[in-house]
Amino acid sequence: MNNDSQQAAHEVDASGSLVSDKHRRRLSGSQKLIVGGVVLALSLSLIWLGGRQKKVNDNASPSTLIAANTKPFHPAPIEVPPDTPAVQEAVQPTVPQPPRGEPERMSHGRKKHRFLHIAVAIKGSASAPVRATWAEDKKTSVTTTPCRMRSVRRERFVDTYETHRAAAQQGTLLPHPDFMVTQGTIIPCILQTAIDTNLAGYVKCVLPQDIRGTTNNIVLLDRGTTVVGEIQRGLQQGDERVFVLWDRAETPDHAMISLTSPSADELGRPGLPGSVDSHFWQRFSGAMLLSAVQGAFQAASTYAGSSGGGMSFNSFQNNGEQTTETALKATINIPPTLKKNQGDTVSIFVARDLDFFGVYQLRLTGGAARGRNRRS
């Protein structure tokens, strides 16, 4: 009796399902997620493979039969440019004329010697037409010998050296060394305004110490002198420093001087470093979206081509890709931004001599002045 009841309990349902037990095993949430991911990956792989297979089929060219070449190979004849009259006049006295019965194999050597004499004649001649003609022959001639190339390089080096060679410079004395800040002086400065390179603009800094003249006797720029600079442009891709041009300095006593000097860091390196924001997600999120949209268009084009509607969908695909590229181009080309905090130390690299002779005057003070008055 009991066996009959157990057998009835485990009998197959009338619907024919073999898994009719109500205590069957269920999939957990993580297992469902894994299965869904696998299915999604397989679907994307099939779409990508289908698009790639179509691209390969479109790019494949029909195989052609190559007929065997039964004719012997003959090299192309060497074209020798005609000699100019000026070159011929310089070459004719030095080129030996071979006898008429000389074999044909000597023609190549005769051409080589002729090129050597042409190079020597051009090197010794200073006329511009000969040089221009030789340059044209160099462009058109195929048989350029190593000797001729060395002559060209030597000629160019001599011309460049003679053009850029500077005359001898004479030493001079500074007219007012006590009142001058010479070129190359590095002046420290503390930023009063923060820097953000999103837009061009002006910056301001204050000198934390006195700046003296060349003799280190007279203070020319007092502590607290304000300096105004200009940021002319922002950063480009790959830049990590911003260029600031310092325009003018004003002392607490209202003495002003034009600097026109570039910025530098504490060690004198050009430009100012800072915190650089490359806008990675803003730039590459658009790139990833563009790639996804193009992949979707390619997959849809493959499907439409296989179903017979490829002609109409290809035009839609091209228009969609152009619209997407136009919309996302500005997002992908976002330039980086450099930010520098207020209070950071920067440097001013003096680019020219600063003369304060017309601003300050020297006079004797203290004991020196009293001694002079006694002598007088």
Curated annotation (Swiss-Prot):
Which purpose does this protein serve, as stated in its record?
VirB proteins are suggested to act at the bacterial surface and there play an important role in directing T-DNA transfer to plant cells.
Q: Where in the cell is it found?
A: Cell inner membrane
Q: What is this protein's name?
A: Protein virB10
Mind listing the UniProt keywords for this protein, alphabetically?
A: Cell inner membrane, Cell membrane, Crown gall tumor, Membrane, Plasmid, Transmembrane, Transmembrane helix
User: One Pfam match, by short name?
Assistant: TrbI
What does the sequence similarity comment in the record state about its family? Belongs to the TrbI/VirB10 family.
Q: Which CDD domains match?
A: VirB10
Q: What is the lineage of its organism?
A: Bacteria, Pseudomonadati, Pseudomonadota, Alphaproteobacteria, Hyphomicrobiales
The record's InterPro entries line, in alphabetical order, gives: T4SS_VirB10/PtlG, T4SS_VirB10/TraB/TrbI, T4SS_VirB10/TrbI
- Annotated source species: Rhizobium radiobacter (Agrobacterium tumefaciens)
Q: Which residues form a coiled coil?
A: none
Q: Which residues cross the membrane?
A: 33-50
Q: How does it sit in the membrane?
A: Single-pass membrane protein
Q: Tell me if Transmembrane helix is a UniProt keyword of this record.
A: yes
Naming one, the record's GO cellular component terms include: plasma membrane
